[in-house]
Amino acid sequence: MKLKTLMLLTLASSIAMADTASSSSSDAHARALFYGLMAVAAGVSIGLGALGAGVGAGSAIRGAEEGMARNPNMAGKLQTIMFIGLAFIETFALYAMLFSIIFVFTGIFSGKAGF
């Protein structure tokens, strides 16, 4: 409960700071709000991607360790399969980071990208 409250207060304060930092013209205000919310969205997407990858990696390692404990002769094969699976799991976090970087730095939603 405290984490949810802290997250909501952080989001509200970042929006309020973006609101007060903009100039008096409505175009500058809209631009500041847009880029502020884009930064928040990028951070949330990276966080959720890392959360999913962490949960998946933990589950994969737990399963491999249980298999190695049950049958120590299969430890080498299980370890190889686990490392391949971990490589695939980590791609989710990397894709989340890649999409966030693309959205923030290319201006794809602001019309600057030429699409």
Curated annotation (Swiss-Prot):
It is a multi-pass membrane protein. It comes from the Bacteria. CDD domains: ATP-synt_Fo_c (cd18121). One of its GO terms (cellular component) is plasma membrane. Pfam families: ATP-synt_C. InterPro entries: ATP_synth_csu_bac/chlpt, ATP_synth_F0_csu, ATP_synth_F0_csu_DDCD_BS, ATP_synth_F0_csu_sf, ATPase_proteolipid_c-like_dom, F/V-ATP_Csub_sf. PROSITE patterns: ATPASE_C. The chain crosses the membrane at residues 32-52, 83-103. The record marks E90 as: Reversibly protonated during proton transport. It is found in: Cell inner membrane. Keywords: ATP synthesis, Cell inner membrane, Cell membrane, CF(0), Hydrogen ion transport, Ion transport, Lipid-binding, Membrane, Transmembrane, Transmembrane helix, Transport. The keyword rRNA-binding does not apply. GO terms for molecular function: lipid binding; proton-transporting ATP synthase activity, rotational mechanism. F(1)F(0) ATP synthase produces ATP from ADP in the presence of a proton or sodium gradient. F-type ATPases consist of two structural domains, F(1) containing the extramembraneous catalytic core and F(0) containing the membrane proton channel, linked together by a central stalk and a peripheral stalk. During catalysis, ATP synthesis in the catalytic domain of F(1) is coupled via a rotary mechanism of the central stalk subunits to proton translocation. Key component of the F(0) channel; it plays a direct role in translocation across the membrane. A homomeric c-ring of between 10-14 subunits forms the central stalk rotor element with the F(1) delta and epsilon subunits. F-type ATPases have 2 components, F(1) - the catalytic core - and F(0) - the membrane proton channel. F(1) has five subunits: alpha(3), beta(3), gamma(1), delta(1), epsilon(1). F(0) has three main subunits: a(1), b(2) and c(10-14). The alpha and beta chains form an alternating ring which encloses part of the gamma chain. F(1) is attached to F(0) by a central stalk formed by the gamma and epsilon chains, while a peripheral stalk is formed by the delta and b chains. Belongs to the ATPase C chain family. This is ATP synthase subunit c. It comes from Hydrogenobaculum sp. (strain Y04AAS1).
